[in-house]
C-alpha cells in the first residue's frame, strides 16, 4: 500500500506546513485594533442572552480605528501648526472642537484641554477709517 491510499495529509500532502500559520482576526480584516478584544468586550457587556456575531466585532473595530485615525490626524495638524512634536490634550481639544462632526459626536470634557479662543464681536473696539469723507 502506498502512502497516498490513506486519508490525511501525510508527508507529501502538505506543502511547507510551516508557512500555514494562524492569523489573528485583526490581521485577516486588515486592521490594527484588536478584533478579538472588542468581541470579548461586546459579549461581556451584551444584555441578557444576546449573541454577538464576528462581523459585528470587525465592523465596530474598523469604525473605532477610523475615528481614532481621524482625531489623531487633526491633532497632529494642530501640533504641527504650533510647531511642537508632541500631541497634548490641548491639541486634541483644538482638533475635536474645530471639526463640526467630531464636535457633535464627542461631547466629553477633555482634561487639560482648555477652551477654544473666542471673543464676542460686541466686545471688540470699532476702528474708524480716516479719510473716507470727501
Swiss-Prot record:
Protein name, per record: Histone H2A.Z
Keyword Transmembrane in annotation: no
Main localization, broad class: nucleus
Gene source species: Saccharomyces cerevisiae (strain ATCC 204508 / S288c)
Residue numbers of N-acetylserine PTMs: 2
Domain of life: Eukaryota
SS bonds (residue pairs): none
The protein's role, per its UniProt record: Variant histone H2A which can replace H2A in some nucleosomes. Nucleosomes wrap and compact DNA into chromatin, limiting DNA accessibility to the cellular machineries which require DNA as a template. Histones thereby play a central role in transcription regulation, DNA repair, DNA replication and chromosomal stability. DNA accessibility is regulated via a complex set of post-translational modifications of histones, also called histone code, and nucleosome remodeling.
Keywords carried by this UniProt record: Acetylation, Activator, Chromatin regulator, Chromosome, DNA-binding, Nucleosome core, Nucleus, Transcription, Transcription regulation
Keyword Hydrolase: no
Family annotation (Pfam families): Histone, Histone_H2A_C
Annotated stretches, region: Disordered: 1-31
CDD domains: HFD_H2A (cd00074)
Residues modified as N6-acetyllysine: 4, 9, 11, 15
Family note: Belongs to the histone H2A family.
Alphabetical list of InterPro entries matching this protein: Histone-fold, Histone_H2A, Histone_H2A/H2B/H3, Histone_H2A_C, Histone_H2A_CS
Biased composition, class Low complexity, residue ranges: 15-31
GO biological process: chromatin organization; chromatin remodeling; heterochromatin formation; nuclear-transcribed mRNA catabolic process, non-stop decay; regulation of DNA-templated transcription; regulation of transcription by RNA polymerase II; silent mating-type cassette heterochromatin formation; transcription elongation by RNA polymerase II
Amino acid at each position: 500500500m502506498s502512502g497516498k491510499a490513506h486519508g490525511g495529509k501525510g508527508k507529501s500532502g502538505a506543502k511547507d506546513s510551516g508557512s500555514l500559520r494562524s492569523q489573528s482576526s485583526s490581521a485577516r480584516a486588515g486592521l490594527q485594533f484588536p478584533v478579538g478584544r472588542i468581541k470579548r468586550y461586546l459579549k461581556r457587556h451584551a444584555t441578557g442572552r444576546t449573541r454577538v456575531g464576528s462581523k459585528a466585532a470587525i465592523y465596530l473595530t474598523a469604525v473605532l480605528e477610523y475615528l481614532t485615525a481621524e482625531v489623531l490626524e487633526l491633532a497632529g495638524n494642530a501640533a504641527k501648526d504650533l510647531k511642537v512634536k508632541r500631541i497634548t490634550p490641548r491639541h486634541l481639544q483644538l482638533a475635536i472642537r474645530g471639526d463640526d462632526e467630531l464636535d457633535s459626536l464627542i461631547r466629553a470634557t477633555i482634561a487639560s484641554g482648555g477652551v477654544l479662543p473666542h471673543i464676542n464681536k460686541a466686545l471688540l473696539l470699532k476702528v474708524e477709517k480716516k479719510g473716507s469723507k470727501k
